[in-house]
């Protein structure tokens, strides 16, 4: 399935990323999170939740990242989702979903397959976010691959 979504315009105030393996076989094969949610706020506060295959929260973490990393994440995400793209989704694979809220309160939502290359200026957004928040097994867009 492919869809064309609106291009992000504005200044990001909040990012929420949900990485969901609940429809994919690999969430059942390992003792891992079936779904993860990370929220990065403009004040650099971060909320992380990991859920099991039963949908119950297995773990959570609240932290604050440095303002420089938060700014870079917001810039990279705005740059990536600020370009027109065709999005494809396989319903039997893991999917990611991102919700961006701009400074005027407008919400933008995008989704894709886990494993997609989501890069800005040659830098993997998944790797940069993992390093910035200090959660090494964060799925984000690439599924921690």
Walk through the language-model features, giving the residues of each:
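N-terminal glycine/threonine-rich, aromatic-flanked beta-hairpin/loop signature
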Residues: 43-53
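Short acidic-glycine loop/turn motifs at beta-strand connectors
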Residues: 39-45, 101-105
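Short, well-ordered, aromatic-rich surface patches in folded extracellular/luminal domains
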Residues: 1-30, 55-63, 68-145
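Short, surface-exposed charged micro-motifs
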Residues: 35-39, 97
């Amino acid at each position: 399935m492919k869809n064309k979504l609106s291009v992000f315009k504005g200044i990001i105030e909040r990012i929420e990323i949900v990485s969901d393996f609940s429809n994919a076989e690999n969430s059942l094969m390992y003792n891992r999170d079936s779904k993860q949610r990370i929220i990065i706020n403009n004040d650099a506060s971060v909320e992380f939740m990991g859920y099991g295959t039963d949908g119950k929260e297995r773990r959570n973490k609240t932290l604050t990242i440095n303002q420089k990393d938060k700014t870079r994440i917001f810039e990279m995400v705005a740059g990536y989702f600020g370009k027109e793209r065709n999005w494809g989704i396989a319903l039997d694979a893991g999917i990611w979903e991102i919700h961006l809220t701009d400074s005027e309160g407008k919400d933008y939502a995008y989704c894709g397959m886990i494993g997609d290359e989501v890069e800005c200026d040659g830098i993997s957004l998944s790797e940069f976010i993992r390093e910035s928040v200090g959660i090494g097994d964060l799925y984000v867009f690439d599924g921690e691959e």
